[in-house]
Amino acid sequence: MTEKDWIIQYDKKEVGKRSYGQESLMSLGNGYLGLRGAPLWSTCSDNHYPGLYVAGVFNRTSTEVAGHDVINEDMVNWPNPQLIKVYIDGELVDFEASVEKQATIDFKNALQIERYQVKLAKGNLTLVTTKFVDPINFHDFGFVGEIIADFSCKLRIETFTDGSVLNQNVERYRAFDSKEFEVTKISKGLLVAKTRTSEIELAIASKSFLNGLAFPKIDSENDEILAEAIEIDLQKNQEVQFDKTIVIASSYESKNPVEFVLTELSATSVSKIQENNTNYWEKVWSDADIVIESDHEDLQRMVRMNIFHIRQAAQHGANQFLDASVGSRGLTGEGYRGHIFWDEIFVLPYYAANEPETARDLLLYRINRLTAAQENAKVDGEKGAMFPWQSGLIGDEQSQFVHLNTVNNEWEPDNSRRQRHVSLAIVYNLWIYSQLTEDESILTDGGLDLIIETTKFWLNKAELGDDGRYHIDGVMGPDEYHEAYPGQEGGICDNAYTNLMLTWQLNWLTELSEKGFEIPKELLEKAQKVRKKLYLDIDENGVIAQYAKYFELKEVDFAAYEAKYGDIHRIDRLMKAEGISPDEYQVAKQADTLMLIYNLGQEHVTKLVKQLAYELPENWLKVNRDYYLARTVHGSTTSRPVFAGIDVKLGDFDEALDFLITAIGSDYYDIQGGTTAEGVHIGVMGETLEVIQNEFAGLSLREGQFAIAPYLPKSWTKLKFNQIFRGTKVEILIENGQLLLTASADLLTKVYDDEVQLKAGVQTKFDLK
């Protein structure tokens, strides 16, 4: 493996969304805080966006739009403590005009390093900066810088904590009120603010040095900015070093954030932060690296990039003290306002198999919001608990009723809140965690109540029809391009993904009852009826309709749209701009019915369909894959990995690999037309790692046993990674036509179709089939 497999390096200046996207990819974090990878010298502009976020810290604002008050709850962009300005002989240096630029994110050491060379009237000036975050003392982070010039001059460095910042990362959100906090206090090395409506106190303490000399505080023209400065005579070719140590805390997780940051600041330093950072990531890569040797130039690097961002989005060291989960963009940008979606389903299984304590921490975020979910259901006239499609601070619904169509710049209705399947995803995550860990305490700590209350919601929605089948109306599936029937409102009926996942949930509820968990009798009785009689629409070829009457929708001339527009991954917006609705057509944003295969596997889904007294042909998976692939535009990054996994099952390894390669580089290549500017796509990052491990390596941990049946692409000569299954660490190595397994404790496994007992610490070899 070479150095390039551990870094992303940018050597040319980019502008606009491409620059924003690079800064998202170069973000640092530790589960508690996220620091966007903008240059230290930059402020919010068309080309740069510094951002600092803390998990769980949200604020609400109100803006009048078309005569209506629109309430938005946003993950707060904190005051910016990483801003510097450099003056030479009294003139501000414009690093945007650098003649040389190099920006690097180092995954192995979790460092962001930037180098700028500027040509000035007197000669050349070079600035090198390195940013780092402390994963152990997770409130701490900092940076160091080096300056050298090939001439003598008066050097002045100013460093700031800028409390004038707004939430401005997402261009289409800028029309809304985006001032999230008010600065309440500034003193030497300390800025304190409070969010405007959620009233969370934010405290930032810092100390800055140049060659060991402390920066004095200076007056600022802006009373929202803490400024410090130091000035020296710089000799020709003299290298000077400066650094800043920063500690942040909020009243969301700390009782007295001001006292905390001041005490912690006196106890830490940039060297201590760097030491903790180095030690932490050394262990992460020892435990969690996925090594792939292949003929694809960027694959290994992309795999590590995805691991890096997932491990920054959450980690037990921080999350055990937080009431937070992982948003769809992690802590790297303000896309989707930092809200938590069903995307947890794409990352929680990864945590469960690699750092199970973190998975448990994230599940508690949902359990802690069960009361809010019950209130959501009550407000909507439903029973039980209804989790929101978009969740933030307290767990009420944060989805908007309107959204902006960026094709025609018109505000359109947003019905995405009807994706009630988010509740099924949460229960699924509980199940995956319990399967991989055997930790049933998550159930007694509120998980069982969550299962029961969401079951109440679903069974209340399930209505018995004249056909003797139970039907669920008024919902949406994962495919967001279908919000209702043509010309109607109110969602769709009998979404296959929803109905089959509910069948699965009712089966688990039954199993829990049989294991002695207390389930209300009436609930269990209705569950027994519904789990055998939910409705599906299956045609004569074995295609499972995405929802009832789906086959009656019109077909789309995709070739015509591609000829007219080129990129059609957001064909929904194109159609609406033309005055037609995707509700009328068989077109999908992403895998919907086929998400069942990603969640449960082919065999399990087959059993569920049979349980509902339907029959499928032997080739049903291929039939459904072909049918829906022809109608899917992959408007979500999470779509392709589903098809990749299915293609592995069908033996189409070349196409599976093509889907994987495209998906795994979603952010690096920014395949969604600039959306990485708003933060990385955490869901697809977790999903692609799962495809590598669960599909190509053939690992299955879902059914209570460690089972593996590898089928590597021909272009891969080696695959190596670890998994944790029920407390046992298993080292997996596939190379030279062999599978080699080493378990930390005795473990009964299934290799292809044979059961094998692994002995603790003994490497066991198997021939690949």
Swiss-Prot record:
Keyword DNA-binding: no
Highest rank taxon of the organism: Bacteria
Record note on temperature dependence: Optimum temperature is 35 degrees Celsius.
Record InterPro entries: 6-hairpin_glycosidase_sf, 6hp_glycosidase-like_sf, Gal_mutarotase_sf_dom, Glyco_hydro_65_C, Glyco_hydro_65_M, Glyco_hydro_65_N, Glyco_hydro_65_N_sf, Malt_Pase/Glycosyl_Hdrlase
Binding locations of substrate: 342-343, 589-590
MF annotations from Gene Ontology: carbohydrate binding; hydrolase activity, hydrolyzing O-glycosyl compounds; trehalose 6-phosphate phosphorylase activity
Reported pH dependence: Optimum pH is 6.3.
Catalytic reactions on record: alpha,alpha-trehalose 6-phosphate + phosphate = beta-D-glucose 1-phosphate + D-glucose 6-phosphate
Catalytic residues, chain numbering: 480
BP GO terms, sorted: carbohydrate metabolic process
Keyword annotations: Glycosyltransferase, Transferase
Name of one Pfam family that matches: Glyco_hydro_65N
EC annotation from Swiss-Prot or TrEMBL: 2.4.1.216
Gene3D superfamilies, A to Z: 1.50.10.10, Glycoside hydrolase, family 65, N-terminal domain (2.70.98.40), Maltose phosphorylase, domain 3 (2.60.420.10)
Enzyme class, broadest EC rank: transferase
Family affiliation: Belongs to the glycosyl hydrolase 65 family.
PANTHER family noted in UniProt: GLYCOSYL HYDROLASE-RELATED, PROTEIN-GLUCOSYLGALACTOSYLHYDROXYLYSINE GLUCOSIDASE
Job of this protein: Catalyzes the conversion of trehalose 6-phosphate into glucose 1-phosphate and glucose 6-phosphate.
Subunit and partners: Monomer.
Name under which the protein is recorded: Trehalose 6-phosphate phosphorylase
Gene source species: Lactococcus lactis subsp. lactis (strain IL1403) (Streptococcus lactis)
Gene (UniProt): trePP
